[in-house]
């Protein structure tokens, strides 16, 4: 994989010289090999090592090169046709029954996204570079953006959106860690991290500029929901006191033992 990384990094430095007609065969093959590695889960855009999330920038480079060097073409989806550069993950794929993934009609998964066994997709959308781990449910009309990382046993409720992050290359993707619940119509975007075991209420919107207020500590932070947080939508007064600014409010933090005994509705109501 080291050789592949070197080829992609060098190609990216000269990306402006490539078109669909002029990309050298060696680079073309390296791009497609990288997309295949992402597609089957052997490579991830980001991975947690020693408690820290690290981004594989070269894998993001490969996706951007893929967009640049692939021609537009027609894809037969059985019930209709699509015209795009990136094929669907399961187009003409006889391995789908062996993948252990349940895909309900009208769910869309792009090539280069990985779905672990025992995941369920209701009619939803999963973009290239995304990683969805085992036991996760992507509910109706939920979206998982490019390169987003979704952990084990996560529930993305109806209409929830997990934002994609391809550029800048060094930016972390949006990350939802294991055992999280993301409420209906909530949006977690711009590389925000929701740590293990957190519960996000319906209609919570969190980007990098969204104040995250911890009711217990009275701290305001940005870009990260700590592990075990129970979060609801709210607002904080502006510095001049003339208006309120939308905020995400951490009403409490709970451990795994507490969460296993208490329903999600009870956790949210107690706030």
Curated annotation (Swiss-Prot):
Catalysed reaction, written as an equation: (S)-2,3,4,5-tetrahydrodipicolinate + succinyl-CoA + H2O = (S)-2-succinylamino-6-oxoheptanedioate + CoA
InterPro entries: DapD_Trfase_Hexpep_rpt_fam, Hexapep, THP_succinylTrfase_dom1, THP_succinylTrfase_N_sf, Trans_hexapeptide_repeat, Trimer_LpxA-like_sf
The keyword Cytoplasm belongs to this UniProt entry's keyword annotation: yes
Molecular-function annotations in GO: 2,3,4,5-tetrahydropyridine-2,6-dicarboxylate N-succinyltransferase activity
Keywords, in A-Z order: Acyltransferase, Amino-acid biosynthesis, Cytoplasm, Diaminopimelate biosynthesis, Lysine biosynthesis, Repeat, Transferase
Major location (coarse): cytoplasm
Pathway: Amino-acid biosynthesis; L-lysine biosynthesis via DAP pathway; LL-2,6-diaminopimelate from (S)-tetrahydrodipicolinate (succinylase route): step 1/3
This enzyme's EC code(s): 2.3.1.117
Classification via Pfam families: Hexapep_2, THDPS_N_2
GO CC list: cytoplasm
Keyword Acyltransferase appears in the UniProt entry: yes
GO biological process: diaminopimelate biosynthetic process; lysine biosynthetic process via diaminopimelate
Annotated compartments: Cytoplasm
NCBIfam families recorded: dapD, PRK11830.1
PANTHER family: 2,3,4,5-TETRAHYDROPYRIDINE-2,6-DICARBOXYLATE N-ACETYLTRANSFERASE, ACETYLTRANSFERASE
The family this protein is said to belong to: Belongs to the transferase hexapeptide repeat family.
Protein name: 2,3,4,5-tetrahydropyridine-2,6-dicarboxylate N-succinyltransferase
Organism of derivation: Coxiella burnetii (strain CbuK_Q154)
